[in-house]
From Swiss-Prot:
This is Acetyl-CoA acetyltransferase. Its EC number is 2.3.1.9. Its main location: cytoplasm. It catalyses: 2 acetyl-CoA = acetoacetyl-CoA + CoA. It comes from Haemophilus influenzae (strain ATCC 51907 / DSM 11121 / KW20 / Rd). Keywords: Acyltransferase, Cytoplasm, Fatty acid metabolism, Lipid metabolism, Transferase.
Length: 393
């Protein structure tokens, strides 16, 4: 079976909600990382066989946002593109689909990744407007909440699924806040030290006062304290434990990687960062969707023929502190090797991009720490999880 190698991995900075990147569409963010990933891979765009990009909040973006991003990035019109939606797992599923395409022999080089601008998610009128409204009020529907952050099976916010896990596992408010503080501290230190600079492509943003360059993550809060977190009110249940401080953010950003068959990489003289060892998805009850990484990781480890102890570094998406801690309990995650520079609670969670983003960060962390095996994993709204294991070369 043909090995699949990764020859470049890049992301934009992550912007805060209505922040520095809010005026840059998901399509434009996607185009920026696609173009930069190709540049860093040192290949001609004409050699690309397909572009696959995750994107969740597609309402109003137009047909096939991945196709739009590819064309804006300068990809030739003859090269096809696919947009996929697996909620928070979209960006990592795009990598798995690209790998499958190469393994099957359908492609040699695939651009994969994810893109999201949650700040630009539109509001919708009810569909009955098409039949005519004779009287009464109309309610606008927030596509960000409805299509991105609401459990379609149980009709409640993702935050309630985090509360469910906290109750099921007896995870205290203090434990959640302690994880949030860890994430903020590590991420803020990493930003200050420029740890993420090598994985980030700066974004030029046009403003009324002229062009500005956004080159660092906007969301981490260096002034976060335990006392400040403790003062925050529960966000989803009156007597709950999940707050805005121990949950991930609402954010904008994109990430992309170039996948190449090992034989093609050798033929072109490309330097591979890593090879994909395995990937897997799993399902859990939608009411505790945050536990999805558990079966997904167990399956991925089995496919790779290794144990979790063999993994050197882990990037586990922090959708919610309680969710992360529940997964940590079930998998017995070693915190010394997990989210070593913070996670989504501090960095942010642009949902369609996050799967690719954590893989990009994982790859650069493996290089930084001179480690070999890495695991990337995310929970997925609706009750799923996705995991991928890579081996640095």
């Amino acid at each position: 079976m043909e090995n699949v190698v990764i020859v470049s991995a890049v992301r934009t900075p992550i912007g805060s909600f209505n922040g520095a990147l809010s005026s840059v569409s998901a399509v434009d963010l996607g185009a920026i990382v696609i173009q930069e990933a190709i540049k860093r891979a040192n290949i001609e765009s004409a050699l690309v066989n397909e572009v696959i990009m995750g994107n969740v909040l597609q309402a109003g973006l137009g047909q096939n946002p991945a196709r739009q991003a590819a064309l804006k990035a300068g990809i030739e019109k003859e090269i096809p593109s696919l947009t996929i939606n697996k909620v928070c797992g979209s960006g990592l599923k795009s990598v798995a689909l690209g790998a499958q395409s190469i393994i099957s022999g359908d492609a040699d080089i695939v651009v994969v990744g994810g893109m999201e601008n949650m700040s630009q998610a539109p509001y919708l009128l009810d569909s009955k407007v098409r039949q005519g409204v004779k009287m009464g009020n109309l309610t606008l529907r927030d596509t960000m909440i409805e299509d991105g952050l609401t459990c379609a099976s149980n009709h409640y916010h993702m935050g309630i699924t985090a509360e469910n896990i906290a109750e099921q596992y007896g995870i205290s408010r203090q434990a959640q806040d302690e994880l949030a503080l860890r994430s903020q501290t590590l991420a803020s230190q990493a930003v200050q030290l420029g740890v993420f600079d090598k994985e980030i492509v700066p974004v030029m943003v046009k403003t009324r006062k002229g062009d500005i360059i956004v080159s660092r993550d906007e969301y981490p809060k260096a002034d976060t304290t335990a006392e400040g977190l403790a003062k925050l009110k529960p966000a989803f249940k009156k007597e709950g434990t999940v707050t805005a401080g121990n949950a991930s953010g609402i954010n904008d950003g994109a990430a992309a990687l170039i996948l190449v068959s090992e034989s093609k990489a050798h033929a072109l003289g490309l330097k591979a960062i890593a090879k994909i060892r395995s990937y897997a998805s799993g399902g859990v009850d939608p009411s505790v969707m945050g536990l999805g990484p558990v079966p997904a990781t167990q399956k991925a480890l089995k496919k790779a023929g290794i144990n979790l102890d063999d993994i050197d570094l882990i990037e586990a998406n922090e959708a919610f502190a309680s969710q992360f801690l529940g997964v940590g309990k079930d998998l017995n995650l070693d915190m010394n090797k997990t989210n070593i520079h913070g996670g989504a609670i501090a960095l942010g969670h642009p949902i369609g991009a996050s799967g690719a983003r954590i893989l990009v960060t994982l790859l650069h962390n493996l290089i930084e720490k001179d480690k070999k095996l890495g695991l990337a994993t995310l929970c997925i709204g609706g009750g799923q999880g996705i995991s991928m294991i890579v081996e640095r070369l």
